[in-house]
C-alpha cells in the first residue's frame, strides 16, 4: 500500500509543479496585471496605443495576428524585444527594472490574446 501511495504522489506532485510553472510564465496575478499596465503606459503606450502602432508608417502593432506573423507571439520573444529593441524600436533594458520585462511581456501577450479590449 505504501508503494501505491508513493507511485501516486510523485506524479501528482510533478504535474502540480509543471502546471504552476507554466501558469506563472503565461498568466499574471492581479498585482502583476496592474504593474504590467503601468509599465506599458510608461514605456510602450506612446508608440503602441491599445496595441496598435502610431509612430511610423509600416511600424508593427502588438495585435496577436501581427505577433504571430512575425513569430514573436510568446513571452520570451517579447522580453528580448523589450530589452534589446527591434527595427526602429530601441530597447529598454536600461529603463526596465529586474523582472519588469517579464511582467510587461506577459501583460502584452495577455492583451494581444484578448484583442486589446
Explain the meaning of each model-derived region.
Residues 93-117:
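C-terminal capping alpha-helices of c-type cytochrome domains
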Residues 31-62, 80, 84-90, 110-117:
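Periplasmic/extracellular electron-transfer cofactor-ligation site
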Residues 26, 32, 78-81, 101:
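Generic hydrophobic secondary-structure packing signal
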Residues 2-8, 38-47, 64-72:
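Phosphate-binding glycine-rich loops and adjacent basic patches that engage nucleotide phosphates
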Residues 63-76, 91-102:
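Electron-transfer interface patches adjacent to heme c in soluble/periplasmic c-type cytochromes
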Residues 16-17, 48-52, 73-76:
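Short hydrophobic/aromatic-rich motifs at helix boundaries and adjacent loops
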Residues 23, 37, 83, 97-99:
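Solvent-exposed, well-ordered amphipathic alpha-helical segments
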Residues 1-34, 114-117:
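N-terminal export/targeting leaders of redox proteins
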Amino acid at each position: 500500500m505504501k508503494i501505491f501511495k508513493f507511485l501516486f504522489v510523485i506524479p501528482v506532485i510533478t504535474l502540480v509543479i509543471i502546471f504552476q510553472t507554466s501558469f506563472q510564465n503565461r498568466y499574471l496575478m492581479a498585482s502583476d496585471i496592474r504593474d504590467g499596465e503601468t509599465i506599458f503606459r510608461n514605456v510602450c503606450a506612446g508608440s503602441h496605443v491599445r496595441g496598435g502602432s502610431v509612430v511610423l508608417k509600416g511600424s508593427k502593432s502588438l495585435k496577436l495576428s501581427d505577433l504571430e506573423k512575425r513569430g514573436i507571439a510568446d513571452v520570451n520573444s517579447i522580453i528580448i524585444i523589450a530589452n534589446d529593441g527591434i527595427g526602429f524600436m530601441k530597447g529598454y533594458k536600461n529603463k526596465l527594472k529586474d523582472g519588469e520585462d517579464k511582467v510587461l511581456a506577459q501583460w502584452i501577450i495577455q492583451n494581444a490574446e484578448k484583442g486589446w479590449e
